[in-house]
Amino acid sequence: MKKRGLWLLIGIGIVLMGGLLGRSLWQPDPTNLVTHGLEQLQTATSFRYSLTQHQWVDGKDRVLTQIQGEKSGGNTRILGQMTGSEVEMIKIGDSTYSKDPFNKKWIRFANAPAAQEVFLAELNPLSSLQMKELGEVMLSGQGNVNGEKVWICNLKPSVQNQMMEVFWTDFQYTLYIRKSDKMLVKVTIEAKNKAKSDPMTMTLEFKDIGKKINIQAPDI
């Protein structure tokens, strides 16, 4: 009886170890993982984000853009620096406002569509994630973003963003997808300038996805 009990325990132990080993070795399909992560973020009603863009200029690495933003429905607010200047903007539906960095007064753009096109990546970070084709998607490993475990995927897509296509080429994307809910939480985009072949890197991070965010028009 004792031997039978011992063998039973050993058998249970082997099954449990096999299950844990199989779970640790299991890897998701990278294309499905990326597709699901992009779709979840594109359909999110709200989120907060950061955007940092580096570019080599005259042989030196320059930070062109460094902003914090939040988006709720059709409304967006950003705060940070672009090309060395302070920027604070609010987009409410079809209206866009900018705070003068010197007198701190808000002004409303007369031509809101033109302003939104110029600041497309900053006011709508998801525009940088629009793709015609994903291309080959590779699962390069696992990592950690802000204390959360993620899958890391690499791809060289065909982008669907006119502004990006005009100035950049050879796009390489690295996507960080949270394991717990398959949500896309970080993206690194690398590309080369079409005119000079200088490298560019853009990093996007997303948080508070789906949470309530209140964005209102400023007093002008």
Protein language model regions, located:
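Beta-turn initiation residues at beta-strand->coil junctions
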Residues: 51-55, 80-83, 100-102, 188-193
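Short loop/turn motifs at secondary-structure junctions and domain boundaries
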Residues: 81, 133-134, 165-169
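N-terminal leader/targeting segments and the immediate start of mature chains
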Residues: 2-75, 212-220
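Extended lipid/amphipathic-ligand handling interfaces
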Residues: 36-39, 66-73, 93-94, 173-179, ...
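Acidic/charged, solvent-exposed loop-and-adjacent secondary-structure segments enriched in E/D, K/R, S/T
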Residues: 99-127
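Gly/Pro-enriched, hydrophobic low-complexity segments
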Residues: 149-220
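Short, hydrophobic/aromatic-rich segments at coil-to-beta transitions
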Residues: 44-50, 71-79, 146-154, 162, ...
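A short, amphipathic edge element
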Residues: 28, 128-139
